């Protein structure tokens, strides 16, 4: 208050004392904060300095007000040192910040909504792969009216990711004309791999000996074609999706013989973009063997028939196509022996010309050395009581090895030079060996079944690298021939499947093959290389198993086992035909463990189940 009174008494225009002198009123003004508040109120209310408005002209530099202002700046005008003063537009920026935040939030929510809509559209427009919900199904196709052959093929005909089942069978239908009686008819049927329902059916003019489904146009997404070879003169191509006939070979081209073996697929010979075919016909006399090249696009012959006079004793071998590492193409065939003829020679004779396509002009020097006579077209491959011939993948090579089943045992020939890799003497071997991976050397091994006394069979696994026996066991089985199959897992091991009668505790501990169950009940057993002392009992049937195939569900890494069984009448004739499917991953969890022998440490069921639950199956062909 003293400061206010002192300033009020001062006359206008009077000079203030010298700044160097001590003024108690001025000193009190600088020490008391209350006076600062009063001055602030005066300035806000438009107070007058030296008779002038605060917004008017600047006061004189030597006025008392300037001296006081210089001694003590106004608090609202003080700017801390090191901090810039706020621009005048700061209020406008603060006012627009809520709008920016609103825009950002709106953009984020809009992006989120669009992403959710796209995800939902993809979920509805792109269907999920169908899951094979049927772990097992069985389909009865009625009474079978004869027929000794049991063709069975797996192919995905409806493009749903699951392989379907194709088979042919003979049925008996009543005659329509006075007392003619019943007459057999053949049918080609396609069953859904999902549930066993019939996708399509097509009649056949005769019984079929083989059904093969493949794509004749390499590297394309064309429709799958099924080639059906009859027992006499029929060769037809079917659209696997619809079951319609695409073409049929004119039987007049086989007037001098009948089809002796299933059709064989060749490279493209007529350069129309579709792989071609060859069939082997046999006349009434054995030496008359005839090769006929057939167009894969139209079913018309590619040239005239080519005849060879072959004399031999034993089973008909082949024909099979062998492509060497250098690209030379040979046809393997024979009677009780194996001979080869270059596809180039067949093509030149069929076309009646001297030249051949460049792809057929390649020769394999090691094979050419085995020609029986100079300038002869036939190459001697093997001639010692041949029963069966298989082409199997050779390790570390882009060619195949020749696995030959003879009356004396088993022989593996190297495909490069036709020299024996190993031989195994084994009597009683009649069925085809089943390839698979049992050992750890990534070389194909083979499961064999041989006769081992009355009502007994011995199952044997042979090492494909050395020809030595690595596993064997005798099982009770009264069926003469039972199919064996295998499936490869993701860790490059194979599971082997075979049929036998019940392996009870009594039959395991003694040589007596009679068990508690009747001999007409057969069980499906699985052998895994990781547990050679254990078999898994997966399923059983009372019928006669005539054919079986293993397919792979690539989407779910599962394998399924398809069987074709027939019942028997009291007179011994086949009756009803049944097709069954079994999911292997499901069966592994539900199967019963059969301990062949005691091991140390003992294998528990929990340990086995944990191991089996991790098994995944993959598609990897053993034969090429």
Swiss-Prot record:
SS bonds (residue pairs): none
Name of a matching Pfam family: Beta-prop_FAM234A_B
Matches recorded under InterPro entries: FAM234 (IPR045232), FAM234A_B_beta-prop (IPR055409), Quinoprotein_ADH-like_sf (IPR011047), WD40/YVTN_repeat-like_dom_sf (IPR015943)
GO cellular component, one term: Golgi apparatus
Domain of life: Eukaryota
Entry's localization field: Membrane; Golgi outpost; Cytoplasm, Cytoskeleton, Microtubule organizing center
Keyword field: Cytoplasm, Cytoskeleton, Golgi apparatus, Membrane, Phosphoprotein, Transmembrane, Transmembrane helix
Annotated positions of the Phosphoserine modification: 16, 30, 33, 63
Modified residues (Phosphothreonine): 26
Region (Disordered): 1-91
Transmembrane region(s): 107-127
Topological type in the membrane: Single-pass membrane protein
Family the UniProt entry places it in: Belongs to the FAM234 family.
Listed name of the protein: Protein FAM234B
Organism: Mus musculus (Mouse)
Gene this chain is encoded by: Fam234b
């Amino acid at each position: 208050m003293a400061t206010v009174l002192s300033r009020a008494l001062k006359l206008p225009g009077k000079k203030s004392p010298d700044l160097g002198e001590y003024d108690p009123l001025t000193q009190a003004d600088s020490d008391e904060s209350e006076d600062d508040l009063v001055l602030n109120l005066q300035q806000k209310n438009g107070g007058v300095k030296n008779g002038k408005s605060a917004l008017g002209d600047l006061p004189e530099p030597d006025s008392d007000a300037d001296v006081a202002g210089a001694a003590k700046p106004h608090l609202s005008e003080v700017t801390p040192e090191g901090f810039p003063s706020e621009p005048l537009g700061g209020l406008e920026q603060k006012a627009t910040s809520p709008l920016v935040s609103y825009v950002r939030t709106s953009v984020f929510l809009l992006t989120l909504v669009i992403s959710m809509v796209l995800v939902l559209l993809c979920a509805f427009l792109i269907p999920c792969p169908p899951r094979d919900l049927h772990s097992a199904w069985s389909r009865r196709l009625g009474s079978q009216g004869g027929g000794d052959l049991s063709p069975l093929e797996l192919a995905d005909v409806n493009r749903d990711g699951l392989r379907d089942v194709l088979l042919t069978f003979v049925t008996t239908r009543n005659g329509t004309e006075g007392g003619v009686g019943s007459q057999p008819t053949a049918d080609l049927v396609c069953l859904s791999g999902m549930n066993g329902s019939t996708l399509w059916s097509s009649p056949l003019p005769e019984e079929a000996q083989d059904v093969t489904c493949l794509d004749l146009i390499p590297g394309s997404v064309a429709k799958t074609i099924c080639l059906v070879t009859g027992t006499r003169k029929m060769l037809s191509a079917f659209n696997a999706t619809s079951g319609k006939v695409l073409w049929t070979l004119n039987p007049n081209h086989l007037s001098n013989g009948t089809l002796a073996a299933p059709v064989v697929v060749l490279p493209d010979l007529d350069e129309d973009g579709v792989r071609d075919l060859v069939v082997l016909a046999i006349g009434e006399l054995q030496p008359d063997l005839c090769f006929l090249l057939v167009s894969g696009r139209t079913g018309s012959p590619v040239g005239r028939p080519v005849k060879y006079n072959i004399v031999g004793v034993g089973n008909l071998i082949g024909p099979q196509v062998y492509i060497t590492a250098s690209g030379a193409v040979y046809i393997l065939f024979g009677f009780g022996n194996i001979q080869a003829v270059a596809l180039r020679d067949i093509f030149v004779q069929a076309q009646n010309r001297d030249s051949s396509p460049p792809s057929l002009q390649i020769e394999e020097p090691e094979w050419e050395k085995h020609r029986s006579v100079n300038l002869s077209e036939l190459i001697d491959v093997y001639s010692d009581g041949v029963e069966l011939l298989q082409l199997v993948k050779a390790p570390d090579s882009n060619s195949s090895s020749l696995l030959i089943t003879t009356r004396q045992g088993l022989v593996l020939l190297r495909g490069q030079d036709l020299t024996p890799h190993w031989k195994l003497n084994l009597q009683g071997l009649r069925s085809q060996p089943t390839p698979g991976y049992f050992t750890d050397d990534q070389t194909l091994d083979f499961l064999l079944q041989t006769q081992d006394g009355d009502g007994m069979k011995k199952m044997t696994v042979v090492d494909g690298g050395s020809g030595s026996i690595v596993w064997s066991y005798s099982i009770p089985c009264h069926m003469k021939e039972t199919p064996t199959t295998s499936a490869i897992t993701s860790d490059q091991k194979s599971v082997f499947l075979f049929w036998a009668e019940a392996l009870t505790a009594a039959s395991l501990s003694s040589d007596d093959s009679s068990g508690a169950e009747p001999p007409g009940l057969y069980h499906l057993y699985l052998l895994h290389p990781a547990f050679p002392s254990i078999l898994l009992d997966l399923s059983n049937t009372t019928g006669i198993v005539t054919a079986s195939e293993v397919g792979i569900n690539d989407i779910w890494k599962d394998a399924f086992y398809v069987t074709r069984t027939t019942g028997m009448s009291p007179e011994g004739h086949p009756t009803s035909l049944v097709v069954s499917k079994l999911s292997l991953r499901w069966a592994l969890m539900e199967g019963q463990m059969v301990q062949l022998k005691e091991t140390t440490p003992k294998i528990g069921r929990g340990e086995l189940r944990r191991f089996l639950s991790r098994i995944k199956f993959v598609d990897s062909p053993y034969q090429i």
